[in-house]
């Protein structure tokens, strides 16, 4: 059989790591997988993120940028049913809270960034002014209470 580790939302390391629903209650692709295992459901499915790049680099390339640099986040996201997607972005500082396996973590404060353009899942923005480690999060919802999420770590030097 199959079981679900956490049915809900939880801030742990990042706001999108463990929960299978967003903070607003939107279902992620994990819900689709579990529904397929349990029900063989024909529910409207969550969008899918195929790729996320920052300045044409993958998250495995340890992207370092300078303060005030113009950055470009590009994504390849689609919806299985072809629903129109709405895109949201946020930048958070890296989480350094030390907690034990599953203990409560406080949500981090968003970092204000200067957005230059936001078109179809592609964002051009100015890097944060403060040196340190950050993550940029992308959320793509389909207007049907489903969402795809991804994040990209980067360092401002």
Residues covered by each model-derived region:
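Extracellular and select intracellular beta-sandwich modules with Ser/Thr-enriched
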Residues: 146-152
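Short beta-strand edge segments in extracellular beta-sheet folds
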Residues: 153-157
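Substrate-binding clefts and catalytic carboxylate motifs of secreted carbohydrate-active enzymes
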Residues: 1-102
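A cross-family glycoside hydrolase active-site/sugar-binding cleft signature
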Residues: 3-5, 137, 150
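Short, surface-exposed loop/turn segments at beta-strand-coil junctions that are enriched for proline
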Residues: 126-132, 144
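Short, conserved beta-strand segments of beta-strand-rich sandwich/propeller modules, principally
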Residues: 72, 133-137
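Exoplasmic/lumenal beta-rich domain surfaces
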Residues: 86-126
């Amino acid at each position: 059989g199959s079981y679900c580790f956490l049915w809900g939302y939880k801030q742990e390391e990042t706001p999108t790591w463990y929960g299978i629903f967003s903070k607003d209650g939107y279902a992620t692709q994990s819900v689709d997988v579990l529904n397929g295992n349990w029900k063989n459901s024909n529910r409207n499915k969550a969008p899918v993120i195929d790729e996320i790049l920052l300045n044409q680099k993958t998250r495995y390339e340890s992207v370092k940028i300078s303060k005030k640099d113009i950055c470009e986040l590009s994504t390849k996201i689609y919806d299985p049913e072809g629903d129109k997607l709405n895109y949201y972005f946020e930048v958070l500082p890296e989480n350094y809270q030390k907690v034990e396996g599953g203990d409560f973590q406080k949500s981090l404060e968003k970092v204000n960034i200067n957005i230059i353009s936001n078109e179809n899942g592609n964002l051009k923005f100015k890097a944060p002014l403060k040196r340190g480690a950050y993550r940029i999060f992308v959320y793509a919802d389909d207007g049907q209470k489903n969402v795809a999420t991804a994040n990209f770590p980067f360092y401002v030097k």
